[in-house]
């Protein structure tokens, strides 16, 4: 499994790579996954729908990532949105 970060102008950057069947490598993947979420990134697992259409499923924890996933892609949350309520 590869953990990748999308970086504008650079494409995909490999953050971590390992085999989830090897406990030490799985721990490293989990730690890297958590660091990205803690940094405010979103995580998505690419999938392929029937008919060949490419999609992605957002995940919020490493436990939600399918064991056979080849990669998880991290990307920044969209900026903006509703203004903060004034107090």
Where does each model-flagged region fall?
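Ordered hydrophobic segments in well-structured contexts
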Residues: 5, 41-46, 71-75
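Alpha-mannosidase-like glycoside hydrolase catalytic domains involved in N-glycan trimming
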Residues: 20-21, 46, 64
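A short linear-motif detector with a strong N-terminal bias
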Residues: 21-24, 50-54
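Short, compact, well-ordered microdomains
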Residues: 51-87
């Amino acid at each position: 499994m590869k953990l990748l970060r999308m970086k504008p102008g650079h494409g995909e950057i490999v953050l971590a790579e390992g085999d989830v069947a090897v406990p030490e490598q799985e721990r490293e993947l989990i730690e890297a996954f958590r660091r990205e979420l803690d940094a405010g990134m979103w995580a998505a697992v690419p999938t392929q729908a029937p008919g060949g259409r490419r999609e992605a499923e957002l995940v919020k924890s490493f436990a939600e990532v399918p064991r056979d996933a080849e990669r998880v892609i991290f990307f920044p949350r969209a900026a903006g949105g509703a203004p903060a309520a004034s107090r």
